[in-house]
Amino acid sequence: MRTLWIMAVLLLGVDGSLVQLWKMIFQETGKEAAKNYGLYGCNCGVGRRGKPKDATDSCCYVHKCCYKKVTGCDPKMDSYSYSWKNKAIVCGEKNPPCLKQVCECDKAVAICLRENLGTYNKKYTIYPKPFCKKADTC
């Protein structure tokens, strides 16, 4: 499993907000993001897109749509500030508008993944991209 995690880090990169996103997901779900969601379903992970397989995968689909609305920065590379207070994610007030949007997108997916932990299905953990059907546009 450690090898899978290392491969996911190398494939996905760890700059900017990806590290923050992974931390948020861990804080909300208790799951390591790269290992559990890096290639989950048709939408979780970089470069994946398709009709969601379940509610967990739908969280990632909505997250990708949220990122598409962000302008003025790179959601995957630019860092923002946030804190974990009383078991809640709080996006930093001093973030520029673009990074505030990115933080809110990441916060929403982390909460969505926590709320849908019951739908997490190990059979979708490393789901083959060719099995994904075309998704509706955001």
From Swiss-Prot:
UniProt cofactor note: Binds 1 Ca(2+) ion.
SUPFAM superfamilies: Phospholipase A2, PLA2
Molecular function GO labels: calcium ion binding; calcium-dependent phospholipase A2 activity; phospholipid binding; toxin activity
Catalytic activity reported: a 1,2-diacyl-sn-glycero-3-phosphocholine + H2O = a 1-acyl-sn-glycero-3-phosphocholine + a fatty acid + H(+)
E.C. number: 3.1.1.4
UniProt xrefs under InterPro entries: PLipase_A2, PLipase_A2_Asp_AS, PLipase_A2_dom, PLipase_A2_dom_sf, PLipase_A2_His_AS
Positions of disulphide bridges: C42-C132, C44-C60, C59-C112, C65-C138, C66-C105, C73-C98, C91-C103
Enzyme class: hydrolase
Function according to Swiss-Prot or TrEMBL: Snake venom phospholipase A2 (PLA2) that has strong myotoxic activity with a low phospholipase A2 activity. PLA2 catalyzes the calcium-dependent hydrolysis of the 2-acyl groups in 3-sn-phosphoglycerides.
Name the record gives this protein: Basic phospholipase A2 BP-I
